[in-house]
């Protein structure tokens, strides 16, 4: 991989996008961004607050702007929010400006990885988390598949191992 192309990580919450993204950026000596953290930095508030005040649609509008700006940079690793693929504009931007890697995980692994996480607004409802995650998977998994250049299952690998797998895939390009 002579030139440093942008690498965009997509997938459901709990797939490891942020953790793997940090590993990948260190291994490849690339700048790392997390779209959710970038939104928090710009608003001065956490994601849950933005969801409460602006609703999911308001949050997604902010997300489109952040993703558009960040993906104009060169040689970055970007971990996107799980729902970023809901907007066609985001899917088009990600597809056009870099290599899209879908980090896939099972509902069981998502439940175990997110059970103590209070920063996930979509898991703060009265509906069971399993039901929420199943509904999100039904809605979003086809969208992840639509734009993914590569798909990697993250359930039984460490973040470091997944990062190395991604690097190996990129070297073959």
UniProtKB/Swiss-Prot annotation:
**Gene3D superfamilies (alphabetical):** P-loop containing nucleotide triphosphate hydrolases
Q: Which GO terms describe its molecular function?
A: ATP binding; magnesium ion binding; shikimate kinase activity
Q: Where does substrate bind?
A: 36, 60, 82, 140
Q: What's noted on cofactor binding? A: Binds 1 Mg(2+) ion per subunit.
Where in the cell is the protein located?
Cytoplasm
What Gene Ontology terms describe where this protein resides (cellular component)? cytosol
Highest taxon of the lineage: Bacteria
The record's EC number reads 2.7.1.71
Q: Which PROSITE patterns match?
A: SHIKIMATE_KINASE (PS01128)
Primary enzyme class: transferase
Which residues make up the binding site for ATP? 14-19, 120, 157
Keyword annotations of the record: Amino-acid biosynthesis, Aromatic amino acid biosynthesis, ATP-binding, Cytoplasm, Kinase, Magnesium, Metal-binding, Nucleotide-binding, Transferase
Q: What are the TM regions of this chain, as residue ranges?
A: none
What does the record list as GO biological process? amino acid biosynthetic process; aromatic amino acid family biosynthetic process; chorismate biosynthetic process
Q: In which pathway does it act?
A: Metabolic intermediate biosynthesis; chorismate biosynthesis; chorismate from D-erythrose 4-phosphate and phosphoenolpyruvate: step 5/7
Question: What is the catalytic activity of this protein?
Answer: shikimate + ATP = 3-phosphoshikimate + ADP + H(+)
- What's the cofactor? Mg(2+)
* Family assignment from sequence similarity: Belongs to the shikimate kinase family.
Biological role stated in the UniProt entry: Catalyzes the specific phosphorylation of the 3-hydroxyl group of shikimic acid using ATP as a cosubstrate.
Subunit info here reads:
Monomer.
Give the matching HAMAP family: Shikimate_kinase
Tell me the protein's name: Shikimate kinase
Biological source species = Buchnera aphidicola subsp. Schizaphis graminum (strain Sg)
């Amino acid at each position: 991989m002579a030139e440093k192309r942008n690498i965009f990580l997509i997938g459901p919450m709990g797939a490891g996008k942020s953790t793997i993204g940090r590993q990948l950026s260190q291994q490849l000596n690339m700048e790392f961004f997390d779209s959710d953290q970038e939104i928090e930095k710009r608003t001065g508030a956490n994601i849950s607050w933005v969801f409460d005040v602006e609703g999911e649609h308001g949050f997604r509008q902010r997300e489109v702007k952040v993703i558009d700006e960040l993906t104009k940079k060169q040689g970055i690793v970007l971990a996107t929010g799980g729902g970023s693929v809901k907007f066609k504009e985001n899917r088009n931007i990600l597809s056009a400006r870099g290599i899209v890697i879908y980090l896939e995980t099972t509902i069981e692994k998502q439940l175990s990885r997110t059970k103590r996480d209070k920063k996930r607004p979509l898991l703060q409802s009265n509906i069971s988390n399993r039901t929420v995650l199943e509904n999100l998977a039904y809605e979003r998994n086809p969208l992840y598949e639509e734009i993914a250049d590569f798909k990697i299952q993250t359930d039984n690998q460490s973040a470091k191992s997944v990062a190395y797998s991604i690097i190996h895939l990129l070297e073959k390009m």
